[in-house]
From Swiss-Prot:
Entry annotated with the keyword Coiled coil: no
Physiological role: NAD(H)-dependent dehydrogenase/reductase with a preference for cyclic substrates. Catalyzes stereoselective conversion of 4-oxo-L-proline to cis-4-hydroxy-L-proline, likely a detoxification mechanism for ketoprolines. Mediates the formation of 2,5-dihydroxybenzoate (2,5-DHBA), a siderophore that chelates free cytoplasmic iron, thereby regulating iron transport and homeostasis while protecting cells against free radical-induced oxidative stress.
Keywords for this protein: Cytoplasm, Lipid metabolism, NAD, Oxidoreductase
Name of this protein: Dehydrogenase/reductase SDR family member 6
Underlying gene: bdh2
Species: Aquarana catesbeiana
Length: 245
């Protein structure tokens, strides 16, 4: 018996990193997983796993989200993972950077939740998990201005949805990781003027001496997706190795 037997889970950003690790972990626990991503080629890597279906999806496109919703009869868990990390202070953030980050990190979750929540309400049960960060209202982080602003908004969105629909059987939580060793992080490191120093800087701020793995975050995802967390809603779950202390 798996911890997620019979559950239908839809998630975004499933092609790599936390989204991919979570999709695999969900499937191993018996869930039917519909993993989406804008990168169709990378997404194909998940098709070899039992219990995982894939769909190409741009989470900033309302019409694509609505089309996906019509293809799915039931949804037990919605996991919003897609996000973008902008590097810089407010002075480095142009209006286009601000708009793009907010569109990907916040508006996409608004669109996904607003589209799939009615199905959950009709079922009188549902579970929403949003990806936030400790770089948010939890902790001020250098050169993460618009990113942190967007992730603070995700915490607010999470708590609002949880409060509004708790009596209708809906749970909503968010996950707030610290620095997670993912392909996205490695790409950002390589894009810095001195990648070797950038990596050292990331490691230096980790009180545990290492970065979190995507698989460790996926363990928390499984818990929140399962009935073990049936009494848990409206919370920002920190998994940062003590970085925010």
């Amino acid at each position: 018996m798996g911890r997620l037997d019979g559950k239908v889970i839809v998630l975004s950003a499933g092609a790599q990193g936390i989204g991919k690790a979570a999709a695999i972990a969900f499937a191993k626990e018996g869930a039917k997983v519909i993993a989406t991503d804008i990168n169709g080629e990378k997404l194909k890597e998940l098709e070899s796993y039992k219990g995982i279906e894939t769909r190409v999806l741009d989470v900033t496109k309302k019409d694509q989200i609505e089309k996906l919703s019509k293809e799915i009869d039931r949804i037990d868990v919605l996991f919003n993972v897609a996000g973008f990390v902008h590097h810089g202070s407010i002075l480095d953030c142009e209006e286009a950077d601000w708009d793009f980050t907010m569109n990907v990190n916040v508006r996409s979750m608004y669109l996904m939740i607003k589209t799939f929540l009615p199905k959950m309400l009709a079922q009188k049960s549902g579970n929403i998990i949003n990806m936030s960060s400790v770089a948010s209202s939890i902790k001020g982080v250098v050169n993460r201005c618009v990113y942190s602003t967007s992730k603070a908004a995700v915490i607010g969105l999470t708590k609002s949805v949880a409060a509004d629909f708790i009596e209708q059987g809906i749970r909503c939580n968010c996950i707030c990781p610290g620095t997670v060793d993912t392909p996205s992080l490695r790409e950002r490191i390589e894009a810095r003027p001195d990648p070797e120093q950038a990596l050292k800087d990331f490691l230096a701020r980790q009180k545990t001496g290492r970065m979190c793995t995507a698989e460790e975050v996926a363990h928390l995802c499984v818990y929140l997706a399962s009935d073990e967390a049936a009494y848990v809603t409206g919370n920002a779950h920190i998994i940062d190795g003590g970085w925010s202390l």
